[in-house]
A protein has these predicted regions:
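A short, structured active-site edge motif that brings together acidic residues
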Residues: 59-60, 140-154
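N-terminal helical cap/lid subdomain that shapes the substrate entry/recognition surface
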Residues: 16-104, 115
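Non-catalytic pre-domain segments flanking phosphatase-related domains
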Residues: 1-25, 169
Length: 226
């Protein structure tokens, strides 16, 4: 994205600053403390498919600095194996998600926001797995979970939500550099959380509009009188 495009997008964000928010959450690393579970299941699936370029935690975190699917292809993962990867990984991660716990305070915050503003979950996880997690923790009023099985590109997913809510200011909350880059390209105000997968130093490379270090800081962005 060039400097002129970035300036135009930030002007657009400022013009929408007085509008009510439509809030989009990433799932893994923002709501769910899932890195270790995801890492174990993903690397196991990769090894079983004969791909050995994603062995360490650092390898996975590096992959998440951009679009994960494009990153896999750049590493040499065969495009014709993507469907097989999805078929191998989906049941693993759906079963593994039963072991995943939410970050402290995030269930309450998600419920509060969903009761006050249009709220979505936009994730690279599977839609059904995230929906099961939300049901387990009694989170209601999420308009839709849009997972990788519906659309791989977060840019497209964010833009889809923006089109549904033209009178709202779009916000995307994520925990990776890739999340920040995609949110900015899609025209959403990008919020980086410091408790997720990427360090604050890495997150800053994605040019987030906000960095929050605690759930209460996130609450104050959207529920200042709570």
């Amino acid at each position: 994205v060039g400097p002129i495009t970035r300036i135009r997008k930030r002007i657009t964000k400022r013009r929408r600053a007085g509008h009510p928010p439509v809030v989009m959450f990433d799932f893994d690393g923002v709501v769910a403390d899932s890195f270790e579970v995801f890492y174990a299941e993903f690397t196991t699936a990769m090894r079983e498919l004969g791909f050995d370029k994603l062995e360490t935690r650092e390898d996975l975190l590096k992959l998440m600095e951009g679009n994960a699917i494009k990153g896999l292809l750049r590493l040499g993962f065969p495009v014709w194996k993507l469907r097989q990867l999805s078929e191998e990984f989906r049941p693993r991660i759906e079963a593994a998600n039963a072991r995943v716990e939410p970050f402290e305070g995030m269930i309450e915050l998600l419920s509060e926001l969903a009761g006050s503003h249009p709220t979505y979950v936009i994730t690279s996880n599977q839609t059904s797995a995230v929906e099961a997690f939300l049901r387990k923790h009694a989170v209601e009023n999420i308009i839709e979970v849009i997972g990788a099985d519906k659309e791989h590109s977060k840019i497209k997913k964010i833009r889809k939500v923006r089109k549904r809510h033209p009178g709202h200011a779009a916000w995307y909350i994520g925990d990776t550099k890739g999340d920040m880059v995609e949110a900015n390209i899609a025209g959403a105000t990008s919020v980086a959380v410091a408790w997720g997968w990427h360090s604050v130093e890495t997150l800053q490379k994605g040019r987030p509009d906000h960095v929050v270090y605690h759930q209460d800081s996130l609450r104050s962005l959207f529920l200042p009188n709570a």
